């Protein structure tokens, strides 16, 4: 099924972003594991798996639309401390949210409602799960203090 070139190109833009999010969550999850923060490791490992699923959905859609997937992730910006890592992940999720909203509008413009629905599902996951959880963690650090927060993540 031939897709609109502009939609395919934008789906590729989103794909490279999802691959970057996957990679950033991957490194952060392994850093948390190495530092002994098992709760943070488990959550970020889960997020990495979800980003992989998002990338897979985009990849499959691009192929169905007869496009060529771009499998080179965007640059990642891993943190070196827990607060930096949470902030970096939240910044990434906010970027993804804006990109998904733009993609939804583009898909509607070109009447590609299946791609739009894929992006809408990913947007809901980004807003209601990923970004919300990261905002919660940063709020906990602000209220509890970093030392108490880190102790709660062992």
From Swiss-Prot:
Task: Please write the reaction equations for the catalytic activity of this protein.
Answer: 4 Fe(2+) + O2 + 4 H(+) = 4 Fe(3+) + 2 H2O; Fe(2+)(in) = Fe(2+)(out)
InterPro entries registered for this protein in UniProt = Bacterioferritin, Ferritin-like, Ferritin-like_diiron, Ferritin-like_SF, Ferritin_DPS_dom
| Effect of mutating residue 25 to I | Does not complement ftnA gene disruption, only about 60% catalase activity in strain PAO1
Does Hydrolase count among this protein's keywords? no
GO function terms (MF aspect):
ferric iron binding; ferroxidase activity; heme binding; iron ion binding; iron ion sequestering activity
Loss of this gene results in the following:
Produces about half the wild-type levels of catalase A in strain PAO1 (katA), slight increase in sensitivity to H(2)O(2), a double katA-ftnA deletion is more sensitive to H(2)O(2). When grown in iron-limiting conditions is less sensitive to H(2)O(2). BFR complexes are composed only of BfrB.
Q: Which residues does this entry assign to the site Dual function in ferroxidase center and iron gate?
A: 130
Q: Where does Fe(3+) B bind?
A: 51, 93, 130
* PANTHER family per the UniProt record, alphabetical: BACTERIOFERRITIN (PTHR30295:SF9)
Protein name per its UniProtKB record:
Bacterial ferritin
Please name the source species: Pseudomonas aeruginosa (strain ATCC 15692 / DSM 22644 / CIP 104116 / JCM 14847 / LMG 12228 / 1C / PRS 101 / PAO1)
């Amino acid at each position: 099924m031939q897709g609109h070139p502009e939609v395919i190109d934008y789906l590729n833009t989103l794909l490279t972003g999802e691959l970057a999010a996957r990679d950033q969550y991957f490194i952060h999850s392994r850093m948390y594991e190495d530092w002994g923060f098992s709760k943070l490791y488990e959550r970020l490992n889960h997020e990495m798996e979800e980003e992989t699923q998002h990338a897979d959905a985009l990849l499959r859609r691009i192929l169905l639309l007869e496009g060529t997937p771009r499998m080179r992730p965007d640059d990642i910006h891993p943190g070196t401390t827990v607060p930096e890592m949470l902030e970096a992940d939240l910044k990434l999720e906010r970027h993804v949210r804006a990109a998904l909203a733009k993609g939804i509008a583009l898909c509607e413009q070109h009447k590609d409602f299946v791609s739009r629905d894929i992006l809408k599902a990913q947007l809901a996951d980004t807003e209601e799960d990923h970004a919300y959880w990261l905002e919660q963690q940063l709020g906990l650090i602000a209220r509890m203090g970093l030392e108490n927060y880190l102790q709660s993540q062992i």
